[in-house]
A protein has these predicted regions:
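Mature catalytic domains of secreted/periplasmic carbohydrate-active enzymes
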Residues: 1-278
């Protein structure tokens, strides 16, 4: 198992770090917190074996934290590490928060299960299973990762509404994980029928709005060899004519109440221009 650290550059034990106070105008005021950050990050990079990810949190400019110096030290101690973009420098991957915004480099969307990051007893606005799967699929289909936050209560317990939803998502992943793990984006544009991901010579159509017994999509690339329901292995009839592929013999009703997945195998590595479902 790979190991990483979350590290908050800001430390709330320093009362002068609160953003409504003008601490950043006087270097002598915030310097103790910066020195602490450098010392603690060095300790994390030195005392715990191989570290794969350093996930900073914080929102102030890189000059405040002396981030170039800090990250150079990190990479000297952990040459294979990857670092996120929250020290004020782009580094290795982006971390859009509370929105899913694809980037032209590795990225992961940081999303909450309800409306808060920590535990808030009064926050009952939990996302549904369908919403969570939708976020997961949106990230995977656009080449990103989903970082889903769960806030434990004061006793360290995961709130039951989160547990209930995560169990259902976990069951879905056990059945359909092939469409998510290691997936990359495809040129197929999301529409009302399905989103799509690609793994090797297989493409996956992930449908939250099942079209019934027949569906089609535009395709100008490799020959389509086969199609099946991922959950059951049931084969579908494939008809490829010109720039369209028709899928027939599908169940009239969605096999999964949340998101159903079709696995499509093509001849060789998928290569095609960008197309759009119609």
């Amino acid at each position: 198992m790979r190991m990483g650290f979350y590290y908050s550059l800001e430390d709330w034990r320093f009362p002068h770090q609160l953003p409504h106070l003008p601490m950043w105008e006087d270097k002598s005021v915030y310097q103790p917190m910066v020195e602490q950050a450098h010392a603690q990050v060095r300790e994390l990079m030195t005392n715990y074996g191989k570290v794969d990810i350093l996930w900073y949190d914080g929102s102030f400019p890189s000059g405040i934290w002396r981030s170039e110096e800090l990250n150079a030290m990190v990479r000297s101690l952990q040459p294979e590490i990857i670092i996120n973009d929250r020290s004020g420098l782009p580094e290795d991957f982006g971390t859009p928060e509370q929105h899913i915004s694809p980037q032209d480099r590795p990225w992961e969307a940081c999303m909450t299960m309800n409306d808060t990051w920590g535990y808030t007893a009064g926050d009952k606005n939990y996302k549904s299973v369908r919403q969570i799967l939708g976020m997961l699929i949106q990230c995977a289909s656009q080449g990103g990762n989903l970082l889903l936050n769960v806030g434990p209560d004061a006793e360290g317990r995961i709130p039951e509404p989160a547990v209930e939803r995560l169990r259902v998502v976990g069951e879905w992943m056990r059945t359909n994980g092939k469409a998510i793990y290691g997936a990359t984006r495809t040129p197929l544009v999301t529409h009302s029928f399905a989103s799509s991901t690609r793994v090797g010579d297989r493409m996956y159509l992930l449908s939250a709005h099942w079209p019934g017994s027949t569906a089609s999509f535009g395709w100008c690339g490799n020959r389509v060899l086969s199609a099946k329901l991922l959950a059951t292995g049931e084969r579908l009839i494939v008809e490829q004519k010109g720039d369209r592929v028709w899928l027939r013999g599908m169940p009239q009703y969605a096999p999964d109440p949340n998101v159903s997945v079709i696995e499509i195998t093509v001849e060789g590595e998928p290569k095609w221009p960008e197309v759009r479902f119609t």
